[in-house]
């Protein structure tokens, strides 16, 4: 069974955007309401025009409540991005757990499909996800690509060059995400041509570099 904890862990060294962490259920609900409001607004008007006052009004909260959790609009956007990233990783992990992958491609498809799903049903995801990508703890590839590489290695064994795997996986996921983003920029439900091409591009790019990962390694 794949070790999905490799996908779900917190980013090392990632600073939280939230000024005050909620400690009670009511506080958590209040914070979620603020982020929900921000997500709706960025879908409607884009992140450049978002203000703290808009978020307060949409959430039915006072401006003081907003500032309790976020010092400014940029922090709100970072908070929304953090939530999108957490939900994306949770969706990827759930898909992987459900399908029980037999090849490296099954893992990649799980990530691509999770991204498509969230573009469709997670407000704010298309605007925030993919901006300001975080690097992994070693300063190398984007954090999610590094996590996926570690999962592939855990499931299918160490390749001849793990560093190159992480590098190429980062490029592949970036290419796939760009095409998925373009698909939803053209059509709210996702342009099927771009979604199909995302799979083709990613698979063809990675195929020659993941020949070792055809079958899960022996326990």
Q: How would you name each of these model-derived features?
A:
Residues 33, 41-75:
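Helix-turn-helix
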Residues 37, 41, 58, 114, ...:
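Amphipathic alpha-helical interface segments
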Residues 1-29, 210-219:
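N-terminal intrinsically disordered/low-complexity leader segments
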Residues 83-107:
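Amphipathic alpha-helical linker/stalk segments
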Residues 27-38, 55, 80-92:
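Generic hydrophobic, amphipathic alpha-helix propensity
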Residues 126-130, 161, 214-215:
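Short, hydrophobic secondary-structure boundary micro-motifs
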Residues 94-98, 128-135:
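Short linear capping/connector segments at secondary-structure termini
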Residues 89-90, 106-121, 133-158, 166-174, ...:
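Amphipathic alpha-helical packing segments from all-alpha helical-bundle domains
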């Amino acid at each position: 069974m794949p070790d999905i904890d490799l996908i779900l862990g917190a980013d090392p060294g990632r600073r939280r955007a939230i000024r005050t962490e909620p400690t009670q259920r009511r506080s958590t609900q209040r914070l979620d309401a603020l982020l929900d409001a921000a997500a709706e607004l960025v879908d409607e008007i884009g992140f450049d025009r978002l203000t703290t006052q808009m978020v307060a009004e949409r959430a039915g909260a006072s401006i003081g409540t907003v500032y309790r959790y976020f010092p400014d609009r940029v922090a709100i956007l970072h908070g929304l991005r953090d939530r999108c990233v957490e939900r994306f990783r949770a969706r990827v992990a759930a898909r992987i757990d459900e399908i029980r992958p037999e090849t490296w491609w099954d893992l990649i498809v799980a990530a691509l499909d999770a991204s498509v799903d969230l573009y469709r049903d997670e407000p704010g995801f298309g605007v925030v996800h993919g901006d300001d990508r975080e690097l992994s703890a070693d300063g190398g590839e984007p954090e999610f690509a590094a996590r996926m590489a570690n999962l592939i290695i855990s499931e299918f064994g160490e390749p001849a060059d793990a560093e190159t795997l992480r590098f190429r996986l980062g490029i592949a996921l970036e290419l796939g995400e760009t095409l998925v983003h373009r698909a939803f920029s053209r059509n709210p439900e996702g342009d099927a041509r771009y979604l199909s091409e995302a799979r083709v591009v990613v698979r063809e790019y990675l195929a020659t570099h993941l020949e070792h990962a055809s079958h899960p390694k022996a326990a």
